[in-house]
Curated annotation (Swiss-Prot):
Species, as recorded: Pelobacter propionicus (strain DSM 2379 / NBRC 103807 / OttBd1)
Region ranges (Disordered): 1-26
Protein name: Transcriptional repressor NrdR
Membership in a protein family: Belongs to the NrdR family.
Textual note on the cofactor: Binds 1 zinc ion.
Amino acid sequence: MKCPFCGNSDSKVVDSRPDKGGSGIRRRRECEQCAKRFTTHERIEEMLPLVLKKDGRREPFERTKIISGIKKACEKRPISVEVIERLVDRLETRLQESSEKEISTTLIGEWIMKELHDLDEVAYVRFASVYRSFRDINEFMQELQELLKK
């Protein structure tokens, strides 16, 4: 594992334990060159469906892209990284259970918006404003009105 401090590729594992969700392993490593310690996380590579993009392209599911988008929506909100990770864990579980070979970005986006709606309304509105690509302020206001009715 490459050291984030000095770039050396030799390190030793000094501690291993399951991560909080139990779906991976957290390892503490020590660089054999600079002796600094750092943490790595291992996860099982899941067999997830391909993501069908709006333009017809197919891409592998990328957890980091989903987390990045959700983090942007949750910026400056009282939502921890752990909560976001669990949200994405639930999304991945749902994708695996779907047994589909391909799944549209539209459906993934709807699932995320449902989770965010239940979690934090401001994060929901932020995510929806990007995901739904409102054509004008009226469409955006209509979404806000729907949110206020609930």
